[in-house]
Amino acid sequence: MSPNDAFISAPAKIETPVGPRNEGQPAWNKQRGSSMPVNRYMPFEVEVEDISLPDRTWPDKKITVAPQWCAVDLRDGNQALIDPMSPERKRRMFELLVQMGFKEIEVGFPSASQTDFDFVREIIEKDMIPDDVTIQVLVQAREHLIRRTFEACEGAKNVIVHFYNSTSILQRNVVFRMDKDQVKKLATDAAELIKTIAQDYPDTNWRWQYSPESFTGTEVEYAKEVVDAVVEVMDPTPENPMIINLPSTVEMITPNVYADSIEWMHRNVNRRDSIILSLHPHNDRGTGVGAAELGYMAGADRIEGCLFGNGERTGNVCLVTLALNMLTQGVDPQLDFTDIRQIRSTVEYCNQLRVPERHPYAGDLVFTAFSGSHQDAVNKGLDAMAAKVKPGANSTDVSWEELRDTEWEVPYLPIDPKDVGRDYEAVIRVNSQSGKGGVAYIMKTDHGLQIPRSMQVEFSAVVQNVTDAEGGEVNSKAMWDIFATEYLERTAPVEQIALRVENAQTENEDASITAELIHNGKDVTVDGHGNGPLAAYANALEKLGIDVEIQEYNQHARTSGDDAEAAAYVLAEVNGRKVWGVGIAGSITYASLKAVTSAVNRALDVNHEAVLAGGV
């Protein structure tokens, strides 16, 4: 057995299918029977039931309004993390969800975790919950857990108590070893207890949610029986409805069958006018979004999920994808995604999981065209939109503000990237390292540096080199130390001693510079001229045999006040090597000149090899 095989249950071997073809398989279909153990698995109609709904109506429905959203990142998402969120990360996530516009947020499982209990108490006691936001807490149908849950929520204005028990055939038989009546009694006993305990907390606006967990593995007739019994106990009204959540706890079948089961419940459950029908799709088969959309068309009112699809196993349904799918159809999602990079960075920081490059709407590559024909079509599409605003114009002649009210019609781009805070990216060379968003977020929020997008790839590779060599995680301080060492503190082969710039802002007259430097250990003074300070400095460095070509330049204020600092970023090709340089100084001019020196030293310092921009 090879070393690689030691980590799997059998030797790694792919067997090319050579078995018989299916009966009636067309001659043009050359697929052959495989050795996969298909006999071990049952179709859904055998394992659970065959749901028959020949008069289904959902295929003719359209999504025209957004559902009631409920974000479960802080509970379902958090419990699935290798490293569950710290209190600080939970606060960041909660604040993000509120800022985006979520009005129902599941904040934890306070009876199961002291950390969750403490977080619920914190956001209540610190008055962090807006009046129009309802927190949701999960609890199993057990008395001591229910009482603990109410203790956690004391003092909150609006709370949904979400109680559940599993009703599926498999869990009834294997996990609980209970019959149908016993499982139903678990649910109704919990409902009665919750209703009784709530009377001890009259200052809170209590709402109720019940989930027959593993609904997709439950016979719909029995699911209705349990739901009806719980609803009868809770006695909701049209003015004060309760939530019945029908989770695809494990996605077991195609989205159309899930939609049939939702429409069946929508039609048949008792007291439908007093029920908010909710969906909670998972993504085990990779069709969570489709299941949610079809289930919503089938009669649901509400959808639970996580940002970017975090959650157990393959995750919960992605609320970002769902909401922005609606936006592409002209439906207001009633959530804000105008800065999806910030949303992504915050979620990556909180979850310590990166959002994949191909994730809809938010991945690094989703608005990128690598194919030449795709690039051409995108460019022509943008030009055509510009011509609608100004006949004869192309995309470079019209600002985004002028295009913003124009209907979006660009090939290969289902949404205007700028509507979610992205750019019109033609080709981006993306480093394979993960964590660009997280690195950029920490550098921005903790250190005031808005690293240019293309530089983020380079710096994330620098950070990864350190973690590969030293192991462990890189915290905020360590990240700053890495950044300073890589970009700010190099003094070889060029160290700036003094710079004098003249005519930096004068029109029609070249800028000039006198630079006192230490070059390869020797004091030197060089002069230069150019159409700006950077060009003048490049001209001066040329006299030392250093060829500098500035290819990209970015700058911003890092701090404000009397001791304000500016940060500048320069992408330069230095003696044929393309690198980024960074400068921080009290003025933007001197920060920019420092950035050039930084790039020079990163390109030429033989003792400290730099990561090259673009990996070249």
UniProtKB/Swiss-Prot annotation:
<dbReference type="InterPro" id="IPR013709">
    <property type="entry name" value="2-isopropylmalate_synth_dimer"/>
</dbReference>
<feature type="domain" description="Pyruvate carboxyltransferase">
    <location>
        <begin position="67"/>
        <end position="341"/>
    </location>
</feature>
<dbReference type="InterPro" id="IPR002034">
    <property type="entry name" value="AIPM/Hcit_synth_CS"/>
</dbReference>
<dbReference type="InterPro" id="IPR000891">
    <property type="entry name" value="PYR_CT"/>
</dbReference>
<feature type="binding site">
    <location>
        <position position="280"/>
    </location>
    <ligand>
        <name>Mg(2+)</name>
    </ligand>
</feature>
<dbReference type="GO" id="GO:0003852">
    <property type="term" value="F:2-isopropylmalate synthase activity"/>
</dbReference>
<keyword id="KW-0100">Branched-chain amino acid biosynthesis</keyword>
<keyword id="KW-0479">Metal-binding</keyword>
<dbReference type="GO" id="GO:0009098">
    <property type="term" value="P:L-leucine biosynthetic process"/>
</dbReference>
<feature type="region of interest" description="Disordered">
    <location>
        <begin position="1"/>
        <end position="34"/>
    </location>
</feature>
<dbReference type="InterPro" id="IPR036230">
    <property type="entry name" value="LeuA_allosteric_dom_sf"/>
</dbReference>
<comment type="subunit">
    <text>Homodimer.</text>
</comment>
<dbReference type="InterPro" id="IPR054692">
    <property type="entry name" value="LeuA-like_post-cat"/>
</dbReference>
<keyword id="KW-0460">Magnesium</keyword>
<feature type="binding site">
    <location>
        <position position="76"/>
    </location>
    <ligand>
        <name>Mg(2+)</name>
    </ligand>
</feature>
<keyword id="KW-0432">Leucine biosynthesis</keyword>
<dbReference type="Pfam" id="PF00682">
    <property type="entry name" value="HMGL-like"/>
</dbReference>
<dbReference type="InterPro" id="IPR013785">
    <property type="entry name" value="Aldolase_TIM"/>
</dbReference>
<keyword id="KW-0028">Amino-acid biosynthesis</keyword>
<dbReference type="GO" id="GO:0000287">
    <property type="term" value="F:magnesium ion binding"/>
</dbReference>
<dbReference type="Pfam" id="PF08502">
    <property type="entry name" value="LeuA_dimer"/>
</dbReference>
<keyword id="KW-0808">Transferase</keyword>
<feature type="binding site">
    <location>
        <position position="282"/>
    </location>
    <ligand>
        <name>Mg(2+)</name>
    </ligand>
</feature>
<comment type="pathway">
    <text>Amino-acid biosynthesis; L-leucine biosynthesis; L-leucine from 3-methyl-2-oxobutanoate: step 1/4.</text>
</comment>
<feature type="region of interest" description="Regulatory domain">
    <location>
        <begin position="490"/>
        <end position="616"/>
    </location>
</feature>
<keyword id="KW-0963">Cytoplasm</keyword>
<dbReference type="InterPro" id="IPR005668">
    <property type="entry name" value="IPM_Synthase"/>
</dbReference>
<protein>
    <recommendedName>
        <fullName>2-isopropylmalate synthase</fullName>
        <ecNumber>2.3.3.13</ecNumber>
    </recommendedName>
</protein>
<comment type="function">
    <text>Catalyzes the condensation of the acetyl group of acetyl-CoA with 3-methyl-2-oxobutanoate (2-ketoisovalerate) to form 3-carboxy-3-hydroxy-4-methylpentanoate (2-isopropylmalate).</text>
</comment>
<feature type="binding site">
    <location>
        <position position="316"/>
    </location>
    <ligand>
        <name>Mg(2+)</name>
    </ligand>
</feature>
<dbReference type="Pfam" id="PF22615">
    <property type="entry name" value="IPMS_D2"/>
</dbReference>
<comment type="similarity">
    <text>Belongs to the alpha-IPM synthase/homocitrate synthase family. LeuA type 2 subfamily.</text>
</comment>
<dbReference type="GO" id="GO:0003985">
    <property type="term" value="F:acetyl-CoA C-acetyltransferase activity"/>
</dbReference>
<dbReference type="InterPro" id="IPR039371">
    <property type="entry name" value="LeuA_N_DRE-TIM"/>
</dbReference>
<dbReference type="GO" id="GO:0005737">
    <property type="term" value="C:cytoplasm"/>
</dbReference>
